[in-house]
């Protein structure tokens, strides 16, 4: 299981706090998770909201994104996330004024940009190969998990690299699962479990293990971390790192849509140094 360290950054307002996950990936592949603390946004988005689609003041969001880019010293690459299974490839430098592509996964071999996934309960999943030649990031709520966003992201990595051995390449992948809502706080209906059953991305026993029945009929508590880990393992990815940090419980550091509805988004980032 990964551990993390915390850094305090001087933002000119209050100290911005970021988390640096520790994992077994190549040393020149870097990870960073932002928090709520230390940005320019006013309540209810206070204060380091990085999402443009939540009705926050756009000038505040741009200042918050600039703060993040200054810390990483790379150009940003964000997605217009819509709970899809679409994956895009970043093959040339992205101009900051261009609209973000509509997708929920991205791969890149460029060392000029960082990839950022915005969440407030969904899973951010960051990936790289064992040599550190390619990085990827995807946004995975229950719909994305059930419909194959992880599979599509890894498929895009394989198709870009064209390794001699597809399975050997996949087995060498490293995955980091960032903060998201924990099972005890994520109640879902029967239709969510049925979606996983119908799509058969993992076995029935694994699905049952990730859905704990609630006292109410046709209600379950779903384990997004467990589902993502099972999917990755099924594909052959066993170097999976997560701290299982709960975005719902940790109101000091993370935004949570289930907790607050009108709220911001934090970012999980990966890049090649």
Language model: regions and residue ranges:
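Active-site microenvironment for binding and transforming phosphate-containing groups
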Residues: 1-273
